[in-house]
UniProtKB/Swiss-Prot annotation:
Protein family membership: Belongs to the ADIPOR family.
Name of this protein: Membrane progestin receptor epsilon
Keyword Membrane in record: yes
Cytoplasmic side: 1-86, 138-162, 227-243, 323-343
GO MF annotation, one: steroid binding
Note: Non-classical progesterone receptors involved in extranuclear signaling are classified in 2 groups: the class II progestin and adipoQ receptor (PAQR) family (also called mPRs) (PAQR5, PAQR6, PAQR7, PAQR8 and PAQR9) and the b5-like heme/steroid-binding protein family (also called MAPRs) (PGRMC1, PGRMC2, NENF and CYB5D2).
Entry keyword ATP-binding: no
Function: Plasma membrane progesterone (P4) receptor coupled to G proteins. Seems to act through a G(s) mediated pathway. May be involved in regulating rapid P4 signaling in the nervous system. Also binds dehydroepiandrosterone (DHEA), pregnanolone, pregnenolone and allopregnanolone.
Chief localization: membrane
Lineage, uppermost ranks: Eukaryota, Metazoa, Chordata, Craniata, Vertebrata
Length: 377
């Protein structure tokens, strides 16, 4: 499908200009007629009536006008636009997860108060989950305020996904990885000797891995945000494929759990983690398929403009993946509290998250101030 190369000019719509000799009354009549209709009366636009940066592949109609006011953006969530269900498919999960984390922190009735250091990794993880859904909703609702604000909101959306990914790694590091046989030198050293004949002391290797997990995940979070922001510039031919690939990279932080299931009896020892971990990755594969393939709108452009297009399906399956993740992170927390090691530190949890916020903010600022944004139509 061809794409517009320039935004629609301000004077491309409306009656022709009056002749110089027209009376004042005629000029006033034309001026009144050329005023924008009220928000409720503004029709939705087709793909060739909006700036190129607003056009979604194979989505032909249902576009909102640019610029809209904040009030018009909010009102549009109750109207049949091509962004309406993009909002609701993440706003409803946002409410569900907000309720879930409130119960975990404040209403669980456990012996651990919400401010205990043992719960710091859970706070990091919960903030990532909630921020991701909240930022996605904000980006989809207010993306038609202006071209610059549209870019800013989606940069923030990418940053929130990276923030969530790092928060997940923090939760894994404290709640899930300590329970793996793969990261226990007392288990791995004799295992390698018996299975492979390797006489290797795994103590240093495992210690090195533990020391590098969070720094590497931190660097990946910043790098992924840079790559995704870069994908909104003109050099990127397949931005959706690039963003999908980029956000798959941080999932490698969960490789120890996958290796644990291959080398040891994870299914028998921790069936909750086994089932929900693999089901989560099934949902992620399905979500990636829809995000890259642009099915079903690729098959029948125009039919799924309002309901059923790939981005809505992508939202639904990412929600399901995070739902499963929350389930096994909660189970990992329960096991952690039964025999907790040293309490997580503020600097090793919240401190990392705050530093990441600063770095991601600097990345977004750089891209908003760069000349590449100005060249994007």
């Amino acid at each position: 499908m061809p794409r517009r190369l320039q935004p629609r000019g301000a004077g491309t719509k409306g009656p022709p200009a009056p002749a110089p000799a027209a009376s004042g009354a005629a000029r006033n009549s034309h001026s009144a007629a050329s005023r924008d209709p009220p928000a409720s009366a503004k029709p939705l636009l087709r793909w060739d009536e909006v700036p190129d940066d607003f056009v979604e592949c194979f989505i032909l109609s249902g576009y909102r006008r640019l610029p809209c006011t904040a009030q018009e953006c909010l009102a549009s969530v109750l109207k049949p636009t091509n962004e309406t269900l993009n909002f609701w498919t993440h706003f409803i999960p946002l409410l569900l997860f907000l309720s879930k984390f409130c119960r975990l922190f404040f209403l669980s009735g456990g012996d651990v108060p919400f401010h205990h250091p043992w719960l710091l990794p859970l706070w990091c993880y919960a903030s990532g989950v909630l921020l991701t859904f909240a930022m996605s909703c904000t980006a989809h609702v207010f993306s038609c305020l202006s071209l610059r604000l549209r870019a800013a909101f989606f940069y923030l959306d990418y940053a929130s996904i990276s923030y969530y990914g790092f928060g997940s790694t923090v939760a894994y590091y404290y709640y899930l990885l300590p329970g793996l046989s793969l990261l226990d030198a007392r288990v791995m050293t004799p295992y390698l000797q018996q299975r492979l004949g390797w006489h290797v002391d795994c103590t240093r290797l495992i210690a090195a891995y533990r020391a590098l997990v969070l720094p590497v995940a931190f660097v990946l979070a910043v790098a992924c945000t840079v790559a995704c922001c870069k994908s909104r510039t003109d050099w990127c031919t397949y931005p959706f494929a690039l963003r999908t690939f980029v956000f798959v990279m941080p999932l490698s932080m969960a490789c120890p759990i996958m290796l644990e299931s291959w080398l040891f009896d994870l299914r028998g020892e921790n069936p909750t983690l086994f089932v929900h971990f693999y089901r989560r990755y099934f949902w992620l594969v399905v979500a990636a398929f829809f995000n890259v393939s642009k099915i079903p709108e690729r098959i029948q452009p125009g039919l799924f403009d309002i309901i059923g297009h790939s981005h809505q399906l992508f939202h639904i399956f990412t929600f399901l993946s995070i739902y499963d993740q929350v389930y096994y992170v909660e189970e990992g927390l329960r096991q952690f509290l039964q025999a907790p090691p040293a309490a997580p530190t503020f600097s090793g949890t919240v401190g990392y998250m705050l530093l990441l916020v600063v770095c991601l903010g600097l990345v977004i600022r750089k891209f908003l101030n760069s000349s590449e944004f100005c060249s994007k139509k």
